[in-house]
Amino acid sequence: MIRVYAPASADHLRRLADDRPLEIEVLTAASEDEEDEYDALLVAAEDAPVVITAELDDADAPIRPQDVRAFHLDADGSGDLAWYAPQELDQVLALLDT
């Protein structure tokens, strides 16, 4: 399995909420080192309001709802990325819509 970090918009998340696969550009970490993974997350966060963390068999595969491991977003404007579980997709969408 490969962990990927996908910069995403509210429209991307709505596709996942509708149980549709998401074909989107993804980033991978330089290694499995925690710092490299964090760096990939931060780079992905520069390009979109939300980062989807997913585990895929192939980095080129579409992201399916069951592949999602977390959502990350700056929920309070502090610059810090908050972590949301896959089951909190509706809450993440609500935050983006405010």
Each PLM stretch: what is its role?
Residues 17-71:
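ADP-ribosyltransferase catalytic core
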Residues 14, 42-45, 90-93:
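Generic detector of well-ordered alpha-helical segments enriched in charged/polar residues
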